[in-house]
């Protein structure tokens, strides 16, 4: 075996000089015990000296496998890669939680027109109509209230006695006595009747407001609002599209950053 060593060395030297080099003389066999005598990346045989001063013939695949074993046995310590991956996981969770919240949010119920809603009380209808159609309701209410008060005052002037009626409905005796003994009984009588007729006055005001609103809309003085259901659907679709676009952009950015981090880590491993 020993007399073949010089011949083998000379052959390897010729092959090393004639063939192109891709990895240099000292490449992937740094973890093999013993000094490296000669190594070529394209050659299939590597000649090394063992710990007992014996010449060993190793293939390039074995050399690379011995190099990779210690790298696999000792993974890289947690550093920039794990830190960035942690940030990416947190951002993914935020995006998915925001999308889940947007999808889980129930749609707002369609609010009916207070002028046509019979499911609520008269006073609530009056308040909602005042908020939505205040510019129309206020003039109508003032006109109808004036008509109501004028009617009651005229009735009091004509000698209509409302005291028995007030006693019948159960008003306090203090109020009834004021109406009996007051010199200005006509005004107080008209006011008492005005307050008693409050439900009827509110009903007439709402009816007058409804008729006025229809008239103004038919002649183009008021814009007809779009249906609430269609409006809410359009808004929900727009919000959903915006959230989807933001999720895709965030996902692409995180994928690019993760790929760059992997490339950097693999490059560091190759350098080591």
From Swiss-Prot:
Coiled-coil region list: 229-271
Transmembrane segments: 136-156
Annotated InterPro entries: FAM210A/B-like, FAM210A/B-like_dom
Keyword Lipoprotein: no
Signal sequence region: none
Similarity comment: Belongs to the FAM210 family.
Summary of the function given for this chain in its UniProt record: May play a role in the structure and strength of both muscle and bone.
Protein name in the entry: Protein FAM210A
Native organism: Homo sapiens (Human)
């Amino acid at each position: 075996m020993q007399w073949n060593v010089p011949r083998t060395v000379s052959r390897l030297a010729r092959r090393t000089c004639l063939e192109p080099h891709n990895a240099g003389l000292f490449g992937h066999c740094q973890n093999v015990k013993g000094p490296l005598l000669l190594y070529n990346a394209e050659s299939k045989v590597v000649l090394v000296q063992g710990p007992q001063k014996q010449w060993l013939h190793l293939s390039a695949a074995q050399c690379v496998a011995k190099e990779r074993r210690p790298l696999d046995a000792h993974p890289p310590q947690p550093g920039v890669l794990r830190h960035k991956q942690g940030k990416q996981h947190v951002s993914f969770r935020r995006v998915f939680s925001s999308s889940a919240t947007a999808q889980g949010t129930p749609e707002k119920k369609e609010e009916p027109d207070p002028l046509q809603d019979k499911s609520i009380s008269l006073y609530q209808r009056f308040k909602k109509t005042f908020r939505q159609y205040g510019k129309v309701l206020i003039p109508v209410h003032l006109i109808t209230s004036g008509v109501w008060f004028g009617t009651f005052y005229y009735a009091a002037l004509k000698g209509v006695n409302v005291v028995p009626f007030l006693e019948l409905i159960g008003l306090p005796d203090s109020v009834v006595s004021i109406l009996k003994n007051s010199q200005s009984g006509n005004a107080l009588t008209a006011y008492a009747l005005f307050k008693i007729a409050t439900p009827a006055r509110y009903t007439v005001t709402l009816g007058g407001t409804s008729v006025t609103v229809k008239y103004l809309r038919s002649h183009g003085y008021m814009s007809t609002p779009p249906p609430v259901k269609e409006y809410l659907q359009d808004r929900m679709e727009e919000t959903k599209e915006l959230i989807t676009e933001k999720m895709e952009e965030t996902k692409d950015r995180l994928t690019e950053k993760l790929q760059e981090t992997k490339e950097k880590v693999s490059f560091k491993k190759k350098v080591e």
